[in-house]
Design a protein with these regions (language model features):
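Bimodal feature
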Residues: 1-4, 217-219
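Bacterial N-terminal signal peptides that target proteins for export
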Residues: 2-12
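Bacterial N-terminal signal peptides
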Residues: 11-21
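Sec/Tat signal peptide C-region and signal peptidase I cleavage site
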Residues: 22-26
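Extracytosolic secretory-pathway proteins
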Residues: 27-220
Length: 220
């Protein structure tokens, strides 16, 4: 009897170790220059007071599946984001080139088991569990014609474990050294909110930053 119990216990332990190993393979640090996320968002802007926010949802994280509860959309996305309020400063236009400056700040990533994102409600993108608190550097939103671009770098302030489909994840394992985000922004406005009446749709891809210091080269 004892032998059978010991054998069963050994099998349980081996299964646990196997599952732990599989989970570890699912999450690993992305090398510098590798893609750490894709996202869809909207820049919300109030032209009367020059303030704005950015919100949206993620369509890709490496090693994480089941990002949606149905067909991919804002309303089915488990992972959303929202920035703090930004001060936006338009610069004088140069021909058909328009530039808007935005200061550095903080934004958060959320995991919502029961998503209900709605472009008409900023609060719908900040519901659920906070899984990451990130910084963003000074932004320069560059527009020409019907579209524009934006690029910024950021660092990780804090990340928190979350459970999805029975597995525990942490976004800090993917990009612990920070990230650089590249966005394409539509200059054709859409509906915003009562606080930020102008919305500019956007889509982004971010890559992992490299080490802060390169090793010193050796001389022979």
């Amino acid at each position: 009897m004892t032998k059978h119990l010991n054998g069963a216990l050994r099998c349980v332990l081996e299964l646990f170790l196997l599952l732990s190993t599989i989970s570890g393979f699912a999450q690993k640090k992305v090398p510098a220059g590798g893609i750490v996320w894709n996202s869809v968002g909207q820049v919300y802007f109030n032209p009367n007071n020059g303030t704005g926010q950015v919100a949206g949802y993620f369509t890709y994280f490496p090693g994480i599946n089941d990002l949606f509860t149905g067909a991919p959309s804002a309303g089915t996305a488990h992972f959303t984001f929202r920035s703090d309020t930004l001060q936006l400063q338009p610069l004088p236009a140069q021909g058909n080139l328009n530039v808007i400056l935005a200061g550095a700040g903080v934004w958060k990533v959320y995991y919502n088991p029961t998503p209900a994102g709605d472009w008409g409600s900023l609060d719908s993108f900040s519901e659920g569990q906070v899984v990451a608190v990130l910084t963003h550097g000074t932004k320069e939103l560059i527009g020409t014609g019907a579209a524009g671009t934006n690029m910024f770098s950021g660092d990780v302030i804090a990340t928190y474990d979350f459970v999805l489909a029975g597995q525990t994840y942490n976004l800090g394992k993917i990009f612990p050294g920070g990230f650089t985000n590249f966005s394409t922004i539509s200059n054709v406005p859409s509906s915003g909110t009562s606080e930020f009446p102008v919305g500019l749709p956007s889509a982004s891809t971010a890559i992992a930053k490299g080490p802060e210091h390169r090793p010193e080269s050796s001389t022979k």
